[in-house]
A protein has these predicted regions:
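C-terminal regulatory/interaction module of P-loop NTP-utilizing enzymes
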Residues: 1-311
C-alpha cells in the first residue's frame, strides 16, 4: 500500500472515517476506538448478538486502508487453527521427490521440510507478518465460544505480539495489529484478559441512530418506509423473543421491502416478510396476526424521545 498510514487525530476523525464507510457510531464507541488506537491497546467489545460488533472491525479496516484479519472462535479452537500448522501433504510430496532423486538425507531433509514453504499461516500469525508496512486490524470474533485454555494463549500473544515456532524461530513485527475482541457474553471472559484491554459495551441503537443507519446504508429508501421499519424493529426488540433482530436484519428487511416496491408498511406485507427479521418459528408464530397490527400501531409513535431496549 502506498498511502501513508496514520491513526485518526481526534474522536471526531474516528466518527468521520467510519461514516465514510457507512458505519454510524456514537461518541462512546468513537472514544473507545480512538483510545485503543492511540494507546495501542486491544479493545474488548461486548454486547448481544446482532448489535454490529463485527461490522465495527470491518469498517475500521476499510477506514484505515488496512487488512482485516478475522479469527472466528469456536469450541475446541487450538494453535493449529489459530496460529499455524504444517502442510503435511506437501511435506510428503517433497519426501517422495527426495526419494525419487536419491537426494534424501535425514539432517537436510528435516531442515528442508520445516521451512516457510510448508508453513500454513493462520490468522494470529498472519497478523504479525514481518512484511506488513502498517498494522492490520485483527478481529478475534466471539471469544466466548472458545475454551478458557485458548484465552491463556491469547493473553501471552497480546503481551508482546510474538510467536515462536520451534522449527523456524520467533516471529515478531514492527507494526503490532489493531486488536478488536468481541463477545456475546454467553460466558464470562477471564479478568486477566479483560485487564489487558479497553472495554466497551455495544448496545442496540436507539430510534434516531438506527434510522440514520438505515438511511445511510439505503439512501434510496423512501423516508416514510425507513421510519416505519425502524420504529417497528424498535418495538419488536421489546417483545419477549427467542432471538431479537439485529441491525443487519433491519437493513435486510428494508432492502426486501424496497424490492417488493413497498413505500410504507402494511400488516400483510409484514406478515409475508417475518422470516427476514425472525429466524425461529416460535418467534414468528408469536408475532403473526393481531400482534403485528398492535406493533405497527405502537411503532408510529416511535421517535427521538423514545429508545429501543438496551442490550
Amino acid at each position: 500500500m502506498n498511502v501513508e498510514y496514520g491513526p485518526p487525530e481526534s474522536i471526531e476523525d474516528v466518527q468521520s472515517l467510519l461514516r465514510d464507510q457507512n458505519y454510524i457510531t456514537d461518541r462512546g464507541l468513537a472514544v473507545a476506538l480512538f483510545l485503543s488506537l492511540k494507546l495501542q491497546r486491544p479493545l474488548f467489545l461486548e454486547g448481544e448478538a446482532g448489535v454490529g460488533k463485527t461490522e465495527i472491525a470491518r469498517s475500521l479496516a476499510l477506514a484505515l486502508g488496512t487488512d482485516l484479519i478475522r479469527l472466528q472462535c469456536y469450541e475446541g479452537l487450538d494453535i493449529n487453527q489459530s496460529v499455524y500448522e504444517w502442510n503435511h501433504a506437501r511435506q510428503m510430496l517433497e519426501i517422495r521427490l527426495m526419494e525419487a532423486t536419491g537426494s534424501i538425507d535425514q539432517e537436510s531433509a528435516s531442515r528442508d521440510l520445516f521451512d516457510e514453504r510448508f508453513l500454513i499461516k493462520r490468522p494470529l500469525l498472519q497478523a504479525i507478518d514481518q512484511n506488513r508496512d502498517r498494522p492490520a486490524v485483527l478481529l478475534i470474533d466471539e471469544l466466548d465460544r472458545a475454551d478458557e485454555e485458548f484465552e491463556g494463549f491469547l493473553l501471552e500473544l497480546l503481551a508482546d505480539f510474538q510467536i515462536t515456532i520451534p522449527e523456524i524461530g520467533t516471529y515478531t513485527t514492527e507494526h503490532p495489529p489493531i486488536v478488536l475482541i468481541t463477545s456475546n457474553r454467553t460466558r464470562e471472559i477471564h479478568d486477566a484478559l479483560k485487564r489487558r484491554c479497553l472495554y466497551h459495551w455495544v448496545e442496540y441503537p436507539d430510534y434516531q441512530k438506527e434510522l440514520q443507519i438505515v438511511t445511510t446504508r439505503l439512501p434510496d429508501a423512501p423516508r416514510r418506509l425507513a421510519e416505519q421499519v425502524t420504529g417497528f424493529i424498535q418495538e419488536l426488540r421489546e417483545t419477549e423473543l427467542f432471538k431479537i433482530p439485529g441491525v443487519s436484519e433491519t437493513i435486510d428487511w428494508a432492502t426486501a421491502l424496497m424490492a417488493l416496491n413497498q413505500t410504507a408498511l402494511e400488516p400483510q406485507v409484514i406478515e409475508d416478510t417475518l422470516g427476514i427479521m425472525l429466524k425461529y418459528e416460535e418467534d414468528i408464530a408469536l408475532i403473526r396476526g393481531e400482534p403485528i397490527r398492535s406493533l405497527l400501531e405502537r411503532s408510529q409513535n416511535r421517535g427521538p424521545r423514545r429508545r429501543g431496549r438496551a442490550s
